[in-house]
Each structure stands twice: as C-alpha cells, then as structure tokens.
Regions:
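Transmembrane helical cores of multi-pass secondary ion antiporters/exchangers
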Residues: 1-420
Length: 420
C-alpha cells in the first residue's frame, strides 16, 4: 500500500504537468495564430522550440523516451488524421485534369531524392549502403502539415495546390514500405525477407481497403434532407474521423496492408463520392487536427538534444543542406522536365518539399527497432526536419503570396495585350 502512494502521486504530477503544457501551448498557439498569418513566423517552429525548451535538451519538464510506444503511436495518430483531411481535399475534377504533375513527382522525384541523399550520406557519413538508403527513404516524403499554408490559400493556383497536396499525402504512405523493408533488411533474420512480396502486399491491400471502406462509408451516410434530419452537424465530422481510424485498423489486420495508404485512398474515395463530407470535416474537425499537430511537434521537439543533432559534426550539416537545397529541387526539376510547366511554378514546387510528421514518424519507428545505426539515422533525420521546419516555415507564407500575386497579374496582362 505504501509503495503505491508515491507511484500514484508521481503519476498525478506527470498528468498535471502534461495538461499544463498542453493548455498553455494551445493558448499560445491561438494568440500567435494571427501574427503567424501576417509574418514569416511559423507556429510549427514555435511548438518545436517549446518542446525542445521543455525537454531533455532544455528544462527537462517533458521526459519522453524516443523508444516509447506512446511516441510512435502519437505520431501515427497524427498521420492518420492529417492524411485523411488531405485526402478529402482532393477534388475529382482536378484529379482527372491535373494528375500528371503529382504523378511525376511521386514516380520520379521521390525515388531520385532518396537515391541522391543515400549517395551523399554514404560518402560523407560512412553509413552502409542499406543504412544510407534507409535515411534516403526517411527524407524522401514531404509533409502535409507544413504544406498547409500553401494548399489552403485559395489565391494560389489550383493546379499548384492540388499537386502539392496530392504529393504530400501520397508520398507518406509510399515511403513507408521502403522504410520498413530496409529496416527489416538491417534487422535479425533479414535473410528470409522477400522485399517485393512485402511491398506488393502493403500497397495492394492498402489500396483495396481504402477503396472499399471509402465506398462503403459514402453509401452508409444518409443523403439530402435525411442527412440533416438523422445526423446532427457535429456527428458528421465524428463519422468522418471514425471512418479514418476504422480504415487504418482494417488495413493493418491480416493480411496486413499499408494503413496510411488505405486512409488516404479512403479519404479520396469518400470525398469524391460525397463532396459534402469535406465541408463537415472542415467545419468541425479542424480543431482536432490542430491539437494533434501541436502534440506531435511538441513531443518531437522534446526528444531533441544538441549533442544528438550534431553528433556527426559538419557531415550532418552537409547532408541536411544537400537534401533541402539540392536533392529535392534537382529531383523535381528532372521529374517536371518536358511538362510545359512555367519556370516559376517548377522552381516553387522544387523548393517546397518540407520534411515533417512523416519523417518524424518513420525515424521513430526505425529507432524502436534493433538497428545498430538506428540512433545515428534518427538524429540525421531529426536535424533535417528541424532545419526544414525553420526554412520552409519562413518561406511558405511569402512564397504562397508571391504565387497568388503572380497568378492574379496574368489575366490583367492578357487583357492589356488584347486591348492593345
């Protein structure tokens, strides 16, 4: 009895600290949201810095183990919610008319980015080829959270918003099989691992599950006046969130498909068959998405230490700089060659490939496995994410406004030339 009282007191203290931090950061985020919209300040950067200051690298108030199942599961929940929201944003009209740009980036730019990162990592850091390709796979996806300032700006041309949104949503799920396959190859018993069967099963089951559950959810949801009569407004967003998590759960059950791809495909299917769901989700579920985003970035920040981030010295800085400034931009420019896309659009999409939740989640999954170089790979990925949060956070709002002004100036230029 005596031993349980200190344990209960410690648990209560930890819960009190967690609620204090969560409440304080929610208030801070709300107060700074207007400032962030008018300046280069990124709320994501604020939350990560707050997590770092409160974590082991700072005051030590937040103490999370990177190998804790809680951390990996929180990141996974964040991906499910965010991918589902982004999938609902995919419009059928744009999917039919403008599929070629995101497809080229997924099929060409993504693997080329991973290859370039792997080559430089092998040369500068000295990881094995498999470990280097694992880091390349971790850094190949872009982040739907950090892309939100662009894809939610209605003044930015729809083709750019659609391309970035579809790319950032799909490449999270597409990168996961490669991450897990390479992790398994580095682990024990890798001699019995057949990678192509693994990838085929993950992709196939995930895709089919997403299509079937999305179609079923669209059919179950009442239509027209019956919908308003039988389902209150707040229950419609709960229906959508429930569909997201149910899809993930079904997909990862035997025969074990890719739950993230299933969630995104389900959201696309549901959004196309029932466009009204998109409005319900935007009106009621955005607060949940924001809280999940806040939580994952604060936890991520609390796991960072200066010693870990710069454990590889200047080689780590060089790998991160190459990834953000050369690997992604070069890969996208190669992928978009011959598409007829203007130079400004190519340049913006080449630069805007932020690293965030997906890379964090996958790095945490790698760290939780018995991989000798797991900590080194995690810290390199973490430094890339932190640098990307700052760099892309500083440029997302100014960049989207520049694109918007440029797009709005085009019709006036055409009218002026016609009048002349």
């Amino acid at each position: 009895m005596g031993s349980t009282l200190p344990l209960a007191a410690a648990s209560a203290h930890g819960f009190a600290v967690a609620t204090l931090v969560l409440g304080g950061l929610l208030v801070l985020g709300a107060l700074l949201s207007g400032l962030a919209g008018r300046s280069f300040l990124s709320l994501t950067a604020v939350f990560v810095i707050a997590g770092f200051a409160l974590g082991d690298g700072g005051l030590g108030v937040l103490a999370f183990s990177p190998r804790s199942p809680f951390v990996a599961q929180l990141a996974l929940v964040a991906l499910v919610v965010i991918l589902f929201r982004d999938g609902l944003e995919v419009e059928a009209e744009m999917l039919q008319k403008a599929w070629h740009l995101p497809f080229r980036k997924l099929a060409l730019a993504m693997p080329l980015t991973a290859l370039l990162v792997a080559l430089v990592t092998r040369a500068l850091v000295g990881l094995s080829w498999t470990e280097s390709f694992l880091l390349g796979a971790l850094l190949s996806p872009t982040d739907p959270v950090l892309s939100s300032a662009v894809v939610t700006n209605p003044r930015v041309p729809r083709i750019i918003r659609h391309s970035l949104n579809l790319e950032s949503g799909m490449n999270d799920g597409l990168a996961l099989p490669a991450v897990l396959a390479l992790s398994a190859a580095l682990g024990a018993g890798s001699g019995h691992f057949v990678w192509w069967e693994f990838v085929l099963q993950d992709l196939g089951v995930g895709l089919v599950t997403g299509l079937l559950v999305g179609a079923l959810a669209a059919r179950l949801l009442p239509r027209g006046r019956r919908l308003d009569a039988e389902m209150p407004a707040h229950q419609k967003s709960l229906f959508a969130l429930g569909t997201a998590f149910a899809t993930y759960g079904i997909a990862v059950l035997p025969p074990k498909g890719n739950g993230l791809i299933a969630v995104f495909v389900c959201a696309i299917t549901l959004g196309i068959l029932r466009p009204d769901v998109r409005l319900y989700f935007e009106q009621r579920a955005e607060d949940i998405v924001e809280i999940v985003k806040l939580g994952i970035f604060v936890v991520f920040g609390s796991l960072l230490t200066l010693h870990g981030l710069f454990g590889e010295g200047w080689a780590a800085v060089a790998v991160v700089a190459f990834t953000l400034l050369l690997a992604r931009p070069l890969a996208v420019l190669v992928a978009l060659a011959g598409t007829g896309t203007d130079g400004a659009t190519k340049g913006f999409m080449a630069w805007f490939g932020p690293k965030g939740v997906a890379t964090m989640t996958f790095a945490l999954l790698v760290l939780s496995q018995n991989i000798p170089a797991g900590s080194r790979i995690f810290n390199l990925a973490a430094l890339a994410v932190l640098t990307s949060i700052v760099a892309h956070g500083l440029t997302d709002t100014p960049g989207s406004e520049w694109l918007a002004r440029r797009a709005e100036a085009r019709p006036r230029a055409v009218l002026s030339s016609a009048a002349d």
